[in-house]
């Protein structure tokens, strides 16, 4: 009986680990933020980062998944 319970517990833990790993691999869609996971954009997209400034002071970096052939320029 103890062996059966232990085996069931091990299988549950392994299943949870596999589900979590699968969720981490999920790709980030177009125009969604990829600052913390720059390599997870869906196929055909790239993670493009920008340094944000407010009144001349750098306020951090933000990254977004955009098309690989898309380029943004300042106005």
From Swiss-Prot:
<keyword id="KW-0800">Toxin</keyword>
<keyword id="KW-0732">Signal</keyword>
<dbReference type="GO" id="GO:0090729">
    <property type="term" value="F:toxin activity"/>
</dbReference>
<protein>
    <recommendedName>
        <fullName>U6-lycotoxin-Ls1h</fullName>
    </recommendedName>
</protein>
<keyword id="KW-0964">Secreted</keyword>
<feature type="propeptide">
    <location>
        <begin position="22"/>
        <end position="25"/>
    </location>
</feature>
<feature type="signal peptide">
    <location>
        <begin position="1"/>
        <end position="21"/>
    </location>
</feature>
<dbReference type="GO" id="GO:0005576">
    <property type="term" value="C:extracellular region"/>
</dbReference>
<keyword id="KW-1015">Disulfide bond</keyword>
<comment type="similarity">
    <text>Belongs to the neurotoxin 19 (CSTX) family. 06 (U6-Lctx) subfamily.</text>
</comment>
<dbReference type="InterPro" id="IPR019553">
    <property type="entry name" value="Spider_toxin_CSTX_knottin"/>
</dbReference>
<dbReference type="Pfam" id="PF10530">
    <property type="entry name" value="Toxin_35"/>
</dbReference>
